[in-house]
Amino acid sequence: MSLLETRTQFDLSQAKAALLLNVPLRTYVRYESDDSYGSELKREMMIKTLKDVCEITETKGLLSVEYIKNSLKELFEKEYPNRIEFCYLFGSYAKGYAKENSDVDLCVSTSLSGLDFVGLSESIRTILHKKIDLVRFSNLKNNIELINEIMKDGIKIYG
């Protein structure tokens, strides 16, 4: 993977990539646009550093609400058309105090059940690269406190 491909994978501007790498913008631009400039070892280290800094895993990195919203909208429309009525983000991500190891709490209204619901959960985890806590809205009838939290602090991300 090239420096340009790595930068675009993480949706970074050249200025942001240079800042993360602690190199002048002009130097970064030369490395990205001219393969004969500098050493291959430095270029590989720049790529590795960008991946280390920007990569999202279950225990590293934070997702934006916008990223969660866009990723799940695409998943629901492509893989589960007409099967997801709505989805709310709640918990630490919705309240704005998520940490790198925070899970993503989601409440969905869906007709999926059994292994199909488990498959939905796994698809979301795979796309977001984070642990998720997926609850079905219909299962919350006896949990008024959680319903109130979702209605008060939750962010509608689909439906």
Predicted feature residues:
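Short beta-strand->loop micro-motif that forms the acidic, two-metal-ion catalytic signature
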Residues: D105-V108
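Catalytic core of pol beta-like nucleotidyltransferases
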Residues: M1-R83, K95-E100, T110-G159
